[in-house]
Each structure stands twice: as structure tokens, then as C-alpha cells.
């Protein structure tokens, strides 16, 4: 099915954003895990996987419209060093995505591609949920301070008795 070139470009632009977010969130999850913020790392890793699902849906839609998914470009990956910087960087990605998705929905509806608009609306709902989470975490950091906040995202685990060195 031949799709509109402008719609396909919006789909590809959002695909680029999702591929970038996958990398950024996955790296942040690894940094968080390395720093011992294991509960936070699990959440961030899950967000990376959510972005992967978005990329899959966008890829399928682009292919259905006889377009070529562009996996060769990425936007700038913003890497935070502190938890606050990570949340701020991730918030920027989400704000940009929300703006792009809203613009895309308008174009898709104007071109009568309701299915692509529905795909963007579903992704938009997920991104709005994620930005709400990020803003809540940033508010908590502002109220509690970064050190106290971090004490809430550490998960103490017991050593695995069947781990290395066991028989």
C-alpha cells in the first residue's frame, strides 16, 4: 500500500527518536545499575524496552506503507552523569517526542491516514506517561535532595548461594 511521503517521513523521524531513546535509556540503566541504583535501573531498562516496542510498531507501519525504515540515523544521545542529569536528559527526549507526535498526528489526519495517526496517538500516550514519571522524580529530587532520593532507589539483595564459587 503506497503511503504519503510526508507521513512516511514523520514515521521515520519518530523511528529515529525511538532508536535514540533506546540507546540513551539503556545506557542510563547500565550507569544506574553500576552505581547501585538497582530499582531505578530496572525501571529505566524497561523504558528502553518500551521504546524498542515503539520502534517495532513504527517499522511495521513504514513497511506497510511501502516506505524504507531509516535505521541509519540517530539523534544526539544525551548522557547524564548524575541522576538529576539523567532525568533531565530523558525529559528533553520525551518533550521533543511529544511535540513531534502531535505535529505528526495533525498531518496524518489531514492526509486521512487515520491508522498512522492512531499509531502516533498510542505512542504519545506512553510518552506522556513517561514524562509524568520523570517530572515526578525531578520534583522528588528537588524536595528531598539527590542523596535522600537515591536512598529510595537502592535495592539491597542477598548474595546468591548458588553463585560463583559454589558447588
From Swiss-Prot:
Fe cation 2 binds at residues 51, 94, 127, 130. GO terms for biological process: intracellular iron ion homeostasis; iron ion transport. Binds 1 heme b (iron(II)-protoporphyrin IX) group per dimer. NCBIfam families: bfr. Fe cation 1 binds at residues 18, 51, 54, 127. It catalyses: 4 Fe(2+) + O2 + 4 H(+) = 4 Fe(3+) + 2 H2O; Fe(2+)(in) = Fe(2+)(out). Keywords: Heme, Iron, Iron storage, Metal-binding, Oxidoreductase. InterPro entries: Bacterioferritin (IPR002024), Ferritin-like (IPR012347), Ferritin-like_diiron (IPR009040), Ferritin-like_SF (IPR009078), Ferritin_DPS_dom (IPR008331). Iron-storage protein, whose ferroxidase center binds Fe(2+), oxidizes it using dioxygen to Fe(3+), and participates in the subsequent Fe(3+) oxide mineral core formation within the central cavity of the BFR protein shell. This is Bacterioferritin. The keyword Iron applies. PROSITE patterns: BACTERIOFERRITIN, FERRITIN_LIKE. Pfam families: Ferritin (PF00210). It comes from Streptomyces coelicolor (strain ATCC BAA-471 / A3(2) / M145). The keyword Metal-binding applies. Heme b binds at residue 52. GO terms for cellular component: cytosol. The lineage of its organism: Bacteria, Bacillati, Actinomycetota, Actinomycetes, Kitasatosporales. One of its GO terms (molecular function) is iron ion binding. Its cofactor is heme b.
Amino acid at each position: 500500500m503506497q503511503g504519503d511521503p510526508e507521513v512516511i517521513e514523520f514515521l521515520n523521524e519518530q523511528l529515529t527518536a525511538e532508536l535514540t531513546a533506546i540507546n540513551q535509556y539503556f545506557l542510563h540503566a547500565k550507569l544506574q545499575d553500576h552505581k547501585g541504583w538497582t530499582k531505578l535501573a530496572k525501571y529505566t531498562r524497561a523504558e528502553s524496552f518500551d521504546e524498542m516496542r515503539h520502534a517495532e510498531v513504527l517499522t511495521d507501519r513504514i513497511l506497510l506503507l511501502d516506505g524504507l525504515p531509516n535505521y541509519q540515523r540517530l539523534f544526539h544521545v544525551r548522557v547524564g552523569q548524575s541522576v538529576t542529569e539523567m532525568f533531565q536528559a530523558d525529559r528533553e527526549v520525551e518533550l521533543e517526542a511529544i511535540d513531534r507526535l502531535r505535529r505528526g498526528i495533525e498531518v496524518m489526519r489531514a492526509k486521512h491516514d487515520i491508522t498512522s495517526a492512531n499509531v502516533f496517538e498510542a505512542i504519545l500516550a506512553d510518552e506522556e506517561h513517561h514524562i509524568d514519571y520523570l517530572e515526578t522524580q525531578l520534583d522528588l529530587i528537588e524536595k528531598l535532595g539527590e542523596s535522600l532520593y537515591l536512598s529510595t532507589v537502592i535495592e539491597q539483595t542477598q548474595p546468591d548461594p548458588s553463585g560463583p564459587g559454589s558447588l
